[in-house]
Amino acid sequence: ISALNLNTPLIESGSAKRLLKQSTEQVRTKPVSEKFTGEIVVTPDCLSDFLGFITGDISDGKIISKTSIYKEKLNQQITDPRFTLHAQPVSDEITDGYFITDDGYVAENNTIIDNGVLKTHLLSLYGANKTGGERAVNGGGAFVVDAGEKPKDEIIRNIKKGILLERFSGGRPSADGEFSGVAKNSY
């Protein structure tokens, strides 16, 4: 939890209360009774793991080494069209943003993925010079995801078979973007 003031009790901040409740519910874990194919609803607390996979793949290391699955995907669809991701390090609504990039430029807010379309790689000046790409106006982080049209409860109610993914434990995706892991604090 990051905050500019401590006027709100810690337990009421962010998702602390919900996560602590889930931890008590997970004392006696139960395996899924059978293998199934279904839908995944990824909660905001879990989403950062998956965002890290994407942003790591569009940053200097993977773009310079040409191992990114997104290296030739600028202005192309890479996610569901309902997904929009912004990096807003200088937004007044972000308490743990930043004003200067790692390579010394003034940071700006931007949109990384717009309605599923990759709009930028997160290249530093070094990465841009090495690849001929464009230097990003920020280094990512301070993420804001646009809200969908339906509340979480309605989404869950309309799923016949699936999982509400609250925590994920797994390795980095393979070179082709596939991943595997364990669902934790999930229902």
Where are these regions (language model features)?
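Internal alpha/beta scaffold segment
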Residues: 1-54, 58
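Dual-mode signal for accessory low-complexity, basic/Gly-rich regions
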Residues: 73-187
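An exposure/low-complexity boundary signal
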Residues: 33-70, 164-187
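Conserved active-site and cofactor/substrate-binding residues in soluble primary-metabolism enzymes
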Residues: 11-18, 35, 45, 49, ...
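Extended amphipathic alpha-helical scaffolds
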Residues: 1-11, 43, 55, 64-86
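Generic preference for well-ordered secondary structure
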Residues: 3-7, 24, 58, 63, ...
